[in-house]
């Protein structure tokens, strides 16, 4: 595809559209720096040399959650929250309790364009204000026009299933058969078994009734509105846009393969969406593009060839964006028992490889596992294994012996963060006699990591040691390897998949039974520090750092001349970070961070540092 010329032609056509909102409101005055911001903060994230980087040139890792499945429901009119106050409360908890620095923010086409050709600016205003709540908390945002099973309006009031996405007028435009999934055990089977879903989806991709054109126009107007109604500083925190959730052909044309569909149908759509982003003022932000939904399915009969194999080099305009769910574990049939060490190293390694092959960064924008029901007992191990695979492409059992093979640290947003979990009031498909209240109130799902307690305070539904993690949010140079042993629990059992080897006795003694993370990186002259999120379980006063830069128990406050320091994360939520300053070039650095031994002696710290220095030189030098 000749993308530059295509974009140039489309920009000429779209320039008039891009100005439709210029009189709809004045951009807010530039906001002051967020509480806790330091001189190197508040810069945009872009793609450079196949990595997400900030304005200082540091490698950036985005970690957080999808906000939220509530957007799929009608009860809050396609918004993640009932109010801005709830959004603010949720954002603070996500940052301080959930350890997140980013959210995939769900939007609804149905709510944005309830009448064909008429964008609902009241909806866009409410959505933008809720986004602002996260940006003000120091959480980066990438919006997503979400859909599942194409539209709720395909489904009968008494149906077992529902969808979300396209507006009613888009469904009314087609003469679709009465929906039926036949013999279905899981809602996702509607994608390939429900003729109404299949035909409507195919019509979208083939632009029947001008559906795709209408969607693209609404997407552009939405992006223009957001750009114009956030301050420049706030808009800096918007990372990019996810054009379409979990794309699938619906129905393949005669003789068409899944790979050909990606090449001939899906990719041209992404090029059109990219041009709309440019016209709306998002030209410096990447599109987070997803391959065919089934490209990386881990059940063989579900898998379809894909992964944007024919898209060529994506470069800075795109991020390779995918989902991963362990369908074997979710099935309750194909995976007896629980997940173990290195369970998903291969699956997430494939994501790294495809992102590298396309010349861009990768992200797993959805992953998770049911927290209720017959397979919920697998959740602690499945999620631990998924986070382990985001951190490194190695199993814990082999990490210490070959850390330089660890690979990049992947960005990821867990599904999901819905504070209304278990408190919904959703008339399913508009049926007043079928009001859903439990779980996520959508197709029997229950995956939210958070809920509100009796005092309406957000509380975690999963082990905080699993969710609030140590991770390198910004690396000044190139990551060589990273691992984090979270010691999360499966019931009463503490899961330890990456123990410190006996060949490092002083490091092992220092860590003890505590949590620890270890980052290796090679500096590139960047003056801004390397930054790791400090979980709440790592109080500054009792956190130990052993590094080639020095040792510290209770790191001091940050200054430009302090090599190992701690500081608040921007946003004023109480979350914190470790800052490691090494403004040299081409030097291998390491930092072990642990909450193990209390008040370790200088002798122990020195001995542990000596062991780690020798190990790093041998294994990664």
Where are these regions (language model features)?
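Aromatic-rich peripheral "rim/lid" segments of glycoside hydrolase catalytic domains that contact
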Residues: 308-315, 321, 374-544, 567-620
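Secretory targeting and sorting signals
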Residues: 1-32
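Active-site mouth of glycoside hydrolases
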Residues: 39-53, 59-62, 66-297
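Glycoside hydrolase catalytic-domain groove-lining segments
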Residues: 90, 251-372, 391-392, 403-410
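Low-complexity, acidic Ser/Thr/Pro-rich repeat tracts that form intrinsically disordered stalk/linker regions
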Residues: 28-35, 617-621
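Short conserved micro-motifs at the rims of enzyme active sites and ligand-binding pockets
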Residues: 4, 330-334, 424-426
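Short polybasic amphipathic segments
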Residues: 50-54, 543-546
């Amino acid at each position: 595809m000749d993308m530059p010329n295509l974009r140039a032609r489309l920009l000429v056509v779209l320039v008039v559209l891009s100005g439709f909102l210029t009189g709809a409101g004045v951009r807010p005055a530039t906001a002051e720096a967020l509480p806790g911001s330091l001189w190197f903060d508040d810069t945009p994230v872009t793609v450079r040399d196949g990595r997400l980087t900030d304005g200082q040139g540091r490698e950036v890792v985005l970690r957080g959650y999808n906000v939220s499945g509530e957007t799929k429901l009608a009860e809050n009119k396609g918004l993640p929250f009932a109010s801005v106050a709830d959004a603010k409360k949720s954002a603070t908890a996500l940052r301080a309790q959930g350890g997140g620095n980013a959210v995939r923010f769900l939007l609804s086409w149905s709510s944005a364009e309830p009448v064909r050709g008429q964008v609902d600016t009241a909806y866009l205003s409410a959505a933008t204000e809720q986004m602002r709540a996260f940006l003000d908390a120091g959480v980066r945002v990438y919006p997503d026009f979400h859909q599942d099973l194409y539209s709720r309006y395909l489904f009968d009031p008494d149906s077992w299933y529902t969808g979300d996405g396209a507006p009613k007028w888009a469904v009314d435009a087609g003469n679709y058969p009465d929906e039926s999934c036949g013999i279905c055990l899981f809602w996702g089977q509607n994608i390939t078994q429900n003729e109404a879903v299949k035909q409507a989806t195919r019509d979208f991709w083939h632009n029947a009734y001008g559906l795709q054109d209408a969607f693209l126009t609404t997407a552009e107007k939405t992006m223009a509105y957001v750009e114009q109604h956030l301050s420049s500083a706030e808009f800096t925190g918007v990372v990019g846009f996810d054009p379409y959730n979990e794309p699938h052909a619906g129905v393949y044309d005669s003789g068409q393969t899944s790979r050909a569909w990606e090449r001939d149908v899906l990719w041209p759509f992404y090029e059109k969406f990219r041009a709309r982003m440019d016209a709306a003022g998002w030209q410096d932000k990447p599109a987070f593009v997803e391959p065919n939904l089934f490209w990386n399915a881990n059940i063989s009969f579900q898998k379809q060839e894909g992964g944007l194999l024919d898209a060529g080099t994506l470069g800075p305009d795109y991020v390779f964006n995918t989902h991963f769910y362990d369908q074997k574990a979710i099935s309750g049939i194909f995976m007896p028992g629980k997940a173990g060490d290195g369970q998903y190293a291969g699956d997430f390694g494939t994501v790294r490889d495809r992102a590298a092959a396309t010349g861009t960064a990768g992200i797993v924008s959805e992953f998770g596992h049911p927290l209720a029901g017959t397979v919920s007992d697998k959740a602690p191990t499945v999620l631990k294994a998924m986070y382990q695979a985001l951190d490194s492409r190695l199993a814990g059992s082999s990490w210490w012996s070959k850390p330089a093979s660890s690979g990049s640290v992947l960005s990821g947003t867990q599904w999901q963060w819905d504070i209304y979990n278990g408190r919904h009031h959703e008339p399913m498909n508009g049926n007043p006699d079928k009001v859903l209240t439990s779980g996520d109130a959508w197709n029997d799902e229950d995956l939210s990591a958070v809920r509100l307690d009796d005092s309406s305070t957000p509380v975690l539904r999963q082990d905080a040691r699993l969710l609030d993690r140590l991770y390198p949010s910004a690396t000044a140079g190139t990551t060589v390897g990273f691992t984090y042993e979270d010691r999360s629990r499966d019931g009463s059992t503490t899961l330890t998949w990456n123990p410190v080897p006996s060949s490092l006795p002083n490091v092992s003694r220092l860590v003890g039974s505590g949590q620890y993370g270890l980052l290796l990186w090679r500096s590139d002259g960047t003056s801004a520090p390397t930054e790791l999120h400090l979980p709440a379980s790592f109080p500054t006063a009792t956190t130990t750092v052993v590094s080639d830069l020095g040792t510290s128990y209770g790191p001091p406050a940050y200054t430009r001349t302090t090599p190992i320091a701690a500081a608040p994360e921007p946003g004023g939520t109480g979350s914190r970070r470790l800052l490691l300053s090494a403004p040299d070039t081409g030097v291998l650095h390491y930092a072990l961070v642990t909450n193990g031994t209390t008040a370790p002696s200088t002798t122990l710290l020195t001995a542990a540092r000596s062991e780690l220095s020798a190990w790093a030189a041998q294994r990664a030098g």
